[in-house]
């Protein structure tokens, strides 16, 4: 029969799982932002080779709307700036979460070593 983990360890493991889930969600959002940034950069690159008076269409909902190059570039650059700010914010949050996870993992390992000083004989792996 497997030994039950002490409540303190269980609480720390639950906190660890919450932080891990939070990091996973953050990484997914960050990936989405990075993909959108790549797409915006590609579009801006394509726009740069067009004449200023070129006919441009953009998607608005379910419609294609005629627009001018300057306003589309401004819109894309504004969106790019916002996404870059979000990306930097997510990068900082990711660093903080990774540090918290690392610290919590060390704390859990320390707690486990106090409860199970023989190590591998209990069947618990950190």
Swiss-Prot record:
Task: State its role.
Answer: Molecular chaperone capable of stabilizing a range of proteins. Seems to fulfill an ATP-independent, HSP70-like function in archaeal de novo protein folding.
Report any Pfam family annotated for this entry. Answer: Prefoldin_2
Localization terms from the record: Cytoplasm
Q: Which organism is it from?
A: Saccharolobus islandicus (strain L.S.2.15 / Lassen #1)
Mind listing the GO biological process terms from this record? chaperone-mediated protein complex assembly; protein folding
Keywords of the record: Chaperone, Cytoplasm
- Key word Chaperone present in the record? yes
Q: Which gene encodes it?
A: pfdB
Q: Which HAMAP family match?
A: PfdB
Protein name (database record): Prefoldin subunit beta
Q: Which CDD domains match?
A: Prefoldin_beta_GimC
Has the keyword Signal been applied to this entry?
no
Report the principal subcellular site. cytoplasm
Instruction: Please list the GO terms describing molecular function.
Output: protein-folding chaperone binding; unfolded protein binding
Protein family membership: Belongs to the prefoldin subunit beta family.
Describe the protein's quaternary organization and the partners it interacts with: Heterohexamer of two alpha and four beta subunits.
Q: Which GO terms describe its cellular component?
A: cytoplasm; prefoldin complex
Q: Cross-referenced SUPFAM superfamilies, in alphabetical order?
A: Prefoldin
Enumerate the InterPro entries for this protein: PFD_beta-like (IPR002777), PfdB (IPR012713), Prefoldin (IPR009053)
